[in-house]
Amino acid sequence: YKSDKLDDWKRFADRLNAVAEKLSRCGVRTGYHSHAHDHQPVEGQIPWEIVAENTDPRVILQLDTGNCMCGGADPYAVLTKYAGRNQSIHLKPYSKAAGYEPAIGEDDIPWEKVLSWSENEGRTEWFIVEYEMDKAPVSAIEKSIRYLRTLRPL
């Protein structure tokens, strides 16, 4: 979702709540995946925070670590602000110098902090490794998995 109006974001949160209510009756969970623009101010407020603070706790906040950092936010700080809402996280690398090009472990995201908190306090159930670039994606995913295995046995 994207809008440059605060009221639109609040209406979007209302729509997420309505969908979550309907789908929860069927045993289906609803969530929102973050984009870079979700972490950039709209009328002085951060859209990700508007969504988080105006949705039912059963709405999953699926943080994308790379998009979060690209948008100017600290993925670790964003995760810890909304404990219990990040049942799944997209582990996407991002470097301020090289953008989305580096593999996980060659970027600027504090992976040890992100993983440790997510596993222990965050109640994260799924970690999805994602690579944004077309440049050698298989090689980048292999490097990313190797690095993640140095932090945690998979």
Predicted regions and their residues:
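Active-site acidic/histidine proton-transfer and metal-coordination neighborhood
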Residues: 1-60
